[in-house]
């Protein structure tokens, strides 16, 4: 299938390293690949990564943004046959913006393209703004928990549970998880650092569905928010004794930690909270090697969300890498799992602040994120198209 060959309005990289609004940005390639889907964008959401596309990560002329919702305008043959997608479908998508290998594809635009396995069909009772916040968090966190950390997904997360069992990871950890709604019984605990972030509330929900107890950190003002998403206990990340408090709460037995913030301080917090026998630490960005070297009994790893698209990542090291077929295979199974969770109302999106100022307003939103004026909510912008 083809899309029309005209220019569009989009946020693109400028020659001087800024993000600017352009009315002459290129449309995505007119010829869709087999599993690609073309979408008329109706709403976009912002992520911290959108503010980090500077220096060698910045490509002049490339379109920025990685989450959007809209209406399908054209599909490749595989997107239709394998995923049942067609023109007129309302979808949300997770893609890689500011992509030097595909500079005409990004979320902050009137038109975009996404691989079918990174698209979700919207619920009938959802608007585009609500759906725009789905995407990267739900894919990246699932990859971090149920593959890289090696946690079992459990029967509530089918077909992932049976079709993609987790690989063996070191150190070996015994997991005790009754069915999520099966009453009492011992449950393995996972720490979520950054519980009030969009990835944090996503992680809490997925861990609870998988049958884990969740201990989270956040600022004190967001305690109620974090608890409302299912955290069993919440600790103030700014407290000098937070690591010791978590260690006491878990009786020196914590062995699993997901770091949704990933600074030297949060890595240090997680390492300090993990019990005497060590465990596994997974972050959503590269972690401090210095901190990681402080405890040999803790195995550290980190994940890169765009890897799930299965394509080469053209960003510089340490993010740049060849396409990962294993990540794509995981994502295809996870996509069907996530669609099922969405359809049956088993998950909630992160709290949103919706603005109707379009792509021009996104520039203001990026400044809000840079200046740390956003906490416990996700910025979403509807487009006047």
From Swiss-Prot:
Keyword Ion transport: no
Domain of life: Eukaryota
Gene Ontology MF terms: nucleotide binding; oxidoreductase activity, acting on NAD(P)H
EC number: 1.-.-.-
Residues that coordinate or bind substrate: 136-143, 305-309
Binding locations of NADP(+): 49-52, 196-199, 219-222, 284-285, 374-375
Keywords from the named record: NADP, Nucleotide-binding, Oxidoreductase
Broad class of enzyme this protein falls into: oxidoreductase
InterPro entries (UniProt xref): ADH-like_C, ADH-like_N, GroES-like_sf, NAD(P)-bd_dom_sf, PKS_ER, Trans-enoyl_RdTase-like
Pathway: Secondary metabolite biosynthesis
UniProt keyword Ligase present: no
Reaction catalysis annotation: (2S,4S)-4-hydroxy-4-methylglutamate + 8 malonyl-CoA + 3 S-adenosyl-L-methionine + ATP + 8 NADPH + 11 H(+) = (2S)-3-[(2S)-3,5-dioxo-4-[(2E,4R,6R,8E,10E,12E)-4,6,12-trimethyltetradeca-2,8,10,12-tetraenoyl]pyrrolidin-2-yl]-2-hydroxy-2-methylpropanoate + AMP + 3 S-adenosyl-L-homocysteine + 8 CO2 + diphosphate + 8 NADP(+) + 8 CoA + 6 H2O; (2S,4R)-4-hydroxy-4-methylglutamate + 8 malonyl-CoA + 3 S-adenosyl-L-methionine + ATP + 8 NADPH + 11 H(+) = (2R)-3-[(2S)-3,5-dioxo-4-[(2E,4R,6R,8E,10E,12E)-4,6,12-trimethyltetradeca-2,8,10,12-tetraenoyl]pyrrolidin-2-yl]-2-hydroxy-2-methylpropanoate + AMP + 3 S-adenosyl-L-homocysteine + 8 CO2 + diphosphate + 8 NADP(+) + 8 CoA + 6 H2O
Family: Belongs to the zinc-containing alcohol dehydrogenase family.
Function: Trans-enoyl reductase; part of the gene cluster that mediates the biosynthesis of the tetramic acids Sch210971 and Sch210972, potential anti-HIV fungal natural product that contain a decalin core. The PKS module of tasS together with the enoylreductase tasC catalyze the formation of the polyketide unit which is then conjugated to 4-hydroxyl-4-methyl glutamate (HMG) by the condensation domain of the tasS NRPS module.
Subunit architecture: Monomer.
Protein name per UniProt: Trans-enoyl reductase tasC
Species annotation: Hapsidospora irregularis
